[in-house]
Amino acid sequence: MKKILFILLLLVINAYSNELFTLPDESNFLKEKIRYEILSSKESIFIAMYNFSYKNIAKDLIKASKNGVKVTVVLDKSKVEANDKIYNFLKEANIKVIIPNDSKKMHLKTMIFDDKLALIGSLNFTKKSFENNHDLVYFTKDRKIIQKLKDIRAKFE
């Protein structure tokens, strides 16, 4: 009986460890989830985002940074122009922004919150992506996935 209860408990915990959002249908729910995770983070937030122009997310990252959270953003160099608004907005707020200087496209769309929760998907952080595109975003607490993402993060830092 104890074994069955333990297995059920693990299943319940696992059910809440993974969430899949489909866009554009669940766009508003996803925006709230991302905002909640950013503002609830205590230690660190890592983002690797191919295209990032959504200012509300940038504002939340700045709030988190001002609350002592280490925020690191990796952007693709082809998407960051000299006068890029989000890039400058984040840099002016002392957010660590990395632009890889290699020949490969930085096409990732991922986040890690406090090294405990990961976002993986096809979504760029643009208004168009949230409202007009068919995209998927998956949240997971799977340790193996998070470790792989941390290994990717280490390549950029």
Question: What does each model-identified segment do?
Answer:
Residues 4-13:
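Sec-dependent N-terminal signal peptides
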Residues 15-17:
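Boundary at the C-terminal end of the N-terminal hydrophobic targeting segment
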Residues 24-30, 54:
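A general structural motif
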Residues 33, 37-43, 146-153:
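DNA replication sliding-clamp ring fold and its partner-interaction surfaces
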Residues 36-92:
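Primarily the HKD phosphodiesterase
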Residues 51-55, 77-81, 103-106, 117-118, ...:
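Solvent-exposed loop/turn segments at secondary-structure junctions
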Residues 81-112:
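Ligand-binding grooves and catalytic loops that recognize ribose/phosphate and carbohydrate rings
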Residues 117-157:
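Signature of lipid phosphatidyltransferase scaffolds
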